[in-house]
Amino acid sequence: MKRALFIYNPLSGNRLVPRELDRIIEKFQENDIFLDMYRIAEDNSKIIEAMHRKDIDMIIGAGGDGTIGNVANWMIKEGIKLPYGTLGTGTCNNFTHNIDIPEDMEKAIHIICQGHSYNVDVGIVN
C-alpha cells in the first residue's frame, strides 16, 4: 500500500473536498493508497514537516490554483522530489485545466492512482 499526503483547502471553490471527504478517501483506498490528511491553515509548518517523512510516496494537493501553487512551492523550496497529484477543486483551476486533469473528481483521482505524470516547468517571478 502506498501512502500519500493529501493537502487540501477546505474553503476553496464550493467547499467540495470537506463535503466529499469520505468518497475521496474511499476512492484512494480502493487503489491501495492510504491518505494522511492535512488542511491548509495559517501555520502550515506541520504540512511542510510531513513532506519530509520517509514513508510518504506522493503528495496530493486539492484546491484552487492558489493551493496547488502553494504546495508546489513548498515542495520546491524544501527539495521534495515526490510525485505531485492535483485535484482542481477551486473556482477556476487554470493549472489543472492546462495539464488536462479532468474536473470530474473520480476521473482525476483515477489519473493520480494510475501514476500518470506530466512534466511541468517552474520558475521564479519577482
Predicted regions and their residues:
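Glycine- and acidic-residue-enriched helix-capping/strand-helix junction motifs
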Residues: 11-21
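N-terminal small/polar loop signature for handling phosphorylated ligands or for N-terminal nucleophile
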Residues: 36-81
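Glycine-rich beta-strand-to-loop/alpha-helix junction loops that act as flexible
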Residues: 10, 62-64, 87-89
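Short amphipathic alpha-helical segments
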Residues: 18-20, 71-75, 97-99
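Gly/Ser/Thr-rich beta-alpha loop segments that engage phosphate groups in nucleotides
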Residues: 15, 65-68, 90-92, 102
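Short beta-strand segments enriched in small/hydrophobic residues
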Residues: 2-10
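A short, Lys/Arg-enriched amphipathic alpha-helix followed by its capping loop at the start of a domain
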Residues: 23-33
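Catalytic core of DAGKc-family lipid kinases
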Residues: 5, 31, 38-39, 53, ...
